[in-house]
Amino acid sequence: MADTPSAFAVFDERFHRLLGPSPSLELLLEHHDYPFAHEAGVYLPSTDEIFITSNQFFNSSGQRSIQISKISVGDGSRKATREEIPSDGVPMANGGINYKNGILFCAQGSETQASGLYYMSSSSPYPSSLLISSFYGRPFNSLNDVVIHSDGSIWFTDPIYGYEQGYRPKPELPNQVYRYDPVTKGIRAMADVFGRPNGIAFSPDEKTVYITDTDWIHGDGSMDGMRPSTM
């Protein structure tokens, strides 16, 4: 493990309570075969493990893929280790969050597999199940990130990056933010003013939801400073 200089930008003094007086960054693990650490970052305190999703890469069969990994964090007496998790059950996984006794992933989907919210067990053999994949019959584009309100509702973003990157069908929905109630199975579009809604999080009192709009860069790699890059 290697220490690097502190690189924390603090905009709220309360953050210092979490950082302590001398925060530092520590490299736990690195992997050079593919970009293994990209999204999710779901930490399970009970097992001291982190579930992450890779960035896209082409596997040995030449297919576009995303790999889910489980990181056992380790401590001073043992190094962090990585285990590749079977990822076929969550097609092109991206953002994730703690949910029940496992992880709720945003799956971007493929030409043949649905984009949607997938629940995956945190224990081997890591079975997964689909919660929702459409808005009143119209398939989601390529779900990106997710957060859960204390009332149990699930909020998530759905940009069209999958289509732009060539692995999802033509979109049938705008770039929108949704609220899903897993009890009633009700689904509502909450916002549709974004170019490419991406990250999502609630304020501590849950009265405000923060959403990043990464419209500045599109899925084909094109960048335009006239497009939003905002929160």
Regions found by a protein language model. Name each.
Residues 2-13, 23-66:
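Beta-strand-rich domains and repeat architectures in extracellular enzymes and scaffolds
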Residues 28-34, 83-89, 130-139, 168-169, ...:
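Surface loop/turn motifs at the tips and blade-to-blade linkers of beta-strand repeat domains
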Residues 36-37, 64, 90-92, 113, ...:
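Beta-rich catalytic cores
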Residues 43-47, 98-101, 148-152, 204-206:
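Residue-level detector of Asp-centered blade-edge/turn motifs that repeat once per structural unit
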Residues 50-54, 103-107, 156-158, 210-213:
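Residue position within the beta-strands of beta-propeller blades
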Residues 56-57, 63-109, 115, 131-135:
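Blade-loop segments of beta-propeller domains
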Residues 72-77, 120-126, 181-185:
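Short loop/turn segments that connect beta-strands within beta-propeller blades
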Residues 106-153, 159-165:
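Asp-box/WD-like beta-propeller blade repeats and closely related beta-sheet repeat scaffolds
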